[in-house]
Structure formats: structure tokens, C-alpha cells
């Protein structure tokens, strides 16, 4: 564990970092994962969380973590530099196809219609993974608990009414950081088989970041071996945090070193090296 007295004087100096016990990897079959967790959660405000995200951390509810797996560096934190981003042909088509969607931004809040869409999405896209059985309480802990500057965005299709109201197509949770937007989680209508809601959502976030004059959209972790993560490599240029530095990735050539050597070279925010 990293103790507060071991960190330089900074807003991060009150945080502690510890490694979890091993657990089955959610993304790569047969792999064992560990996480490095930043605590206590009540001290992690938006400014501190921005620095943690720059160092490869993410959050799930109020739980802030980064991968800390023995001998594996498959999870690469990635972000899109919005001013340099150039959509490809498929992305331009997705943007045009879903131009009828109307986005409404609001504080995090529970809505029964959102939860119903979440459960439909999990049952269709992640059946058997556990999240398809999430209770309302689990849903709220995962997506609606935050101590930082977070927003909920719902996307409705005004051209396709449902039961007399505009159809809910997608919901996205987004964190607003000091240097960008961080995509927390997005779920959408799984019955629209020809839709490109996920792609459209990232394009929408890129446009929002530009309008807010924020340089990046953080997309979480990209895993080359995971088909579920493949879509992130379609956004160019894509920057990844490798050996403690953000650099433009060539997704076909990324070859990462073992985690122990890499984390030894990758300092925690404030200049302190990662420890166990």
C-alpha cells in the first residue's frame, strides 16, 4: 500500500493505493486480473479524478481503479484528441443515419425507463455475464453514484414515436474532467440491429468536447484481443497510455511489456511510483 506520508505534498497526498486480491478477468477467458484502487473515495473530487484518469484510472460508481495484473498489460487506457480526430466513412454514415436523435443532458438520476432499457441491453448483449441480473440497487451503485462532475445523457428518436412519446434509444453516463470528457458507460436499444448507436455516441461526445474546448475524450480501456473492445481502435488518431506516457497508437503494432516492469516506470499522479 502507498501511504499518504510517502507522497509529495499535493492534492493527491491524502490518497492511498492498494492492490486487490486476484479475480477472474472479465475480458479475456482464462486470465486472472487484479486492480489497483485509490482510496478514500470521498477525497476524490473532479480535479483529483482528472489526474487519476491521466494516470490510467477509471471509476465504477465511487470505486476508482486501474488494472494491476501480474504479467499482463492487455488493458490500454485510450483517448481521442478531438481536434485531430477525422471520422472515417462508416463513422460519417453513422452520424448521418442517427441525426434525428435528440440528446438531453441532466444530472445523474434514476428513471424507470432507463433501467428497463439497461436490462434489455444487458440481456441481449451480455447474457450470462451477471449484469443481466442487476437489481435496481446494483444499477444505481454502478451508474448513478458519483462524487465528481458527472452527467446523464438520454437520446430519443423524435421521428419514431413509441406509445405516443419519442422513443428512448440510448443512455450514456459521462464525466466532465479538467481536460476532457470521460465515457463511463453507454447502453442502447438492442433491437435496432442495423443501428450504430455506440459509434454515434462517441462522435457526439467528441463534438461536445470540442464545444466545451476540452482536448480529449477518454474511452476507458482498449484490449487488442477482445472483440468487444475492437470498436475503440476505429477512432483515429487514438492515443494510449504506454510506459507512463500518452502517445498515438497503431492498434496493429501495440506490443506491451509485462505489468510489473511497466508499472515500475509509470508513476502515480504526483510523481510516486506504483507499489503494492
Swiss-Prot record:
It is found in: Cytoplasm. GO terms for cellular component: cytoplasm. Its EC number is 2.3.2.29. Keywords: Acyltransferase, Cytoplasm, Transferase. The keyword Cytoplasm applies. It catalyses: N-terminal L-glutamyl-[protein] + L-leucyl-tRNA(Leu) = N-terminal L-leucyl-L-glutamyl-[protein] + tRNA(Leu) + H(+); N-terminal L-aspartyl-[protein] + L-leucyl-tRNA(Leu) = N-terminal L-leucyl-L-aspartyl-[protein] + tRNA(Leu) + H(+). GO terms for biological process: ubiquitin-dependent protein catabolic process via the N-end rule pathway. It holds the Pfam family ATE_C. It comes from the Bacteria. GO terms for molecular function: arginyl-tRNA--protein transferase activity; leucyl-tRNA--protein transferase activity. Functions in the N-end rule pathway of protein degradation where it conjugates Leu from its aminoacyl-tRNA to the N-termini of proteins containing an N-terminal aspartate or glutamate. PANTHER family: ARGININE-TRNA-PROTEIN TRANSFERASE 1 (PTHR21367), ARGINYL-TRNA--PROTEIN TRANSFERASE 1 (PTHR21367:SF1). Belongs to the R-transferase family. Bpt subfamily. This is Aspartate/glutamate leucyltransferase. The gene is bpt.
Amino acid at each position: 500500500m502507498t501511504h499518504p506520508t510517502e507522497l509529495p505534498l499535493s492534492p493527491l497526498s491524502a490518497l492511498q493505493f492498494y492492490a486487490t486480491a486476484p479475480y477472474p478477468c472479465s475480458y479475456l477467458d482464462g486470465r486472472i486480473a487484479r486492480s489497483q484502487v485509490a482510496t478514500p473515495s470521498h477525497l476524490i473530487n473532479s480535479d483529483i479524478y482528472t489526474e487519476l484518469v491521466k494516470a490510467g484510472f477509471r471509476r465504477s460508481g465511487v470505486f476508482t481503479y486501474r488494472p494491476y495484473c501480474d504479467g499482463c498489460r492487455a488493458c490500454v487506457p485510450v483517448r481521442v484528441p478531438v481536434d485531430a480526430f477525422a471520422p472515417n466513412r462508416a463513422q460519417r454514415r453513422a452520424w448521418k443515419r442517427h441525426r434525428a436523435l435528440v440528446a438531453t443532458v441532466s444530472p445523474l438520476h434514476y428513471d424507470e425507463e432507463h433501467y428497463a432499457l439497461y436490462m434489455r441491453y444487458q440481456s441481449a448483449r451480455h447474457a450470462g455475464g451477471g449484469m443481466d441480473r442487476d437489481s435496481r440497487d446494483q444499477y444505481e451503485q454502478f451508474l448513478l453514484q458519483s462524487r465528481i462532475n458527472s452527467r446523464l445523457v438520454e437520446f430519443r428518436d423524435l421521428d419514431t414515436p413509441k406509445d405516443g412519446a419519442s422513443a428512448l434509444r440510448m443512455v450514456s453516463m459521462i464525466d466532465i474532467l479538467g481536460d476532457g470528457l470521460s465515457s463511463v458507460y453507454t447502453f442502447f436499444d438492442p433491437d435496432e440491429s442495423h443501428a450504430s448507436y455506440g459509434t454515434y455516441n462517441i462522435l457526439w461526445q467528441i463534438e461536445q468536447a470540442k464545444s466545451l474546448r476540452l482536448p480529449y475524450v477518454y474511452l476507458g480501456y482498449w484490449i487488442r484481443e477482445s472483440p468487444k473492445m475492437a470498436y475503440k481502435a476505429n477512432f483515429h488518431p487514438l492515443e494510449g497510455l504506454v510506459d507512463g506516457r500518452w502517445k498515438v497508437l497503431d492498434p496493429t503494432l501495440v506490443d506491451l511489456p509485462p505489468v510489473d516492469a511497466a508499472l515500475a516506470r509509470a508513476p502515480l499522479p504526483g510523481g510516486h511510483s506504483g507499489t503494492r
